[in-house]
């Protein structure tokens, strides 16, 4: 993902939430420009720690998604934040998606748009959360 963003985006900063020590160490050792690596202890708050034992590893990652966005908006001087799944790869600039957003809107989220034959909405929900944009205006 990092390399594809670097190739297609003129200006980006990636905030990576490392969910284990090995991931944190490896990412920090790469010294990649435009990347801030955030450890789990830095990020986890009382609410997350309370639900952590009740979730599988995957469920906990999903649970943390909205909190990662809030963490960046609250702790860094940014006017917007885009949540991007770690396995996303860009073949072009994501600006085309952002250009569809009206200035008065604060959130960009898209539905899955499954074909009827492959509809998994009941299991995965209506919205695709691998790319969600938030303005820091509320």
Where do the language-model regions lie?
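Glycosyltransferase catalytic domains, chiefly GT-A lineage
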Residues: 1-138
């Amino acid at each position: 993902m990092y390399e594809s963003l670097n190739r297609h985006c003129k200006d980006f900063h990636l905030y990576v939430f490392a969910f284990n020590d090995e991931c944190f160490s490896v990412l920090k050792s790469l010294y990649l420009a435009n990347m801030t690596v955030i450890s789990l202890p830095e990020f986890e708050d009382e609410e997350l720690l309370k639900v952590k034992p009740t979730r599988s590893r995957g469920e906990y990652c999903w649970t943390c998604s909205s909190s990662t966005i809030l963490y960046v908006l609250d702790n860094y001087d940014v006017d917007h934040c885009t949540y991007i799944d770690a396995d996303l790869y860009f073949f072009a600039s994501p600006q085309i998606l952002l250009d569809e957003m009206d200035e008065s809107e604060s959130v960009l989220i898209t539905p899955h748009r499954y074909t009827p034959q492959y509809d998994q909405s009941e299991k995965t929900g209506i919205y695709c959360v691998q790319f969600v944009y938030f303005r820091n205006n509320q």
